[in-house]
Swiss-Prot record:
Its EC number is 2.5.1.78. GO terms for cellular component: cytosol; riboflavin synthase complex. (2S)-2-hydroxy-3-oxobutyl phosphate binds at S85, T86, R127. Coiled coil: none annotated. The keyword Lipoprotein does not apply. Belongs to the DMRL synthase family. This is 6,7-dimethyl-8-ribityllumazine synthase. 5-amino-6-(D-ribitylamino)uracil binds at F22, A56, F57, E58, T80, V81, I82, F113. Keywords: Riboflavin biosynthesis, Transferase. The gene is ribH. GO terms for biological process: riboflavin biosynthetic process.
Amino acid sequence: MAKITGNLVATGLKFGIVTARFNDFINDKLLSGAIDTLVRHGADENNIDTAWVPGAFEIPLVAKKMATSGKYDAVICLGTVIRGSTTHYDYVCNEAAKGIGAVALETGVPVIFGVLTTENIEQAIERAGTKAGNKGSECALGAIEMVNVLKAI
């Protein structure tokens, strides 16, 4: 029985990163964590392109454009949605998650969900590089692994 795994080597790989401007004080940290991790694992900074969109809801469209361009081995999607007093949070979170997942399934390109969906600003800050690590960094690792596992199949 074969065990198929993906290594964490990003040498020669190209990445697209879509980042939401809304809550950019959090998303900047997620983006920095992702880029740092990609480079530490062998990616060339010149092989990492970033696109900024207004908010998390808009991420899937640009992710799809990147995924279908043929330029990228993987696309990383970063954003932050913090619960407010209305149901807007639920719609944005659900549609962003559905859209990002659909892009991966439709294109066959790894598209990594790195949109924080938090109850409050403290939880978002914790996940952007403090107590709970940096989710942007974790998404970069996931992107590298997915590219390599797909190549191994």
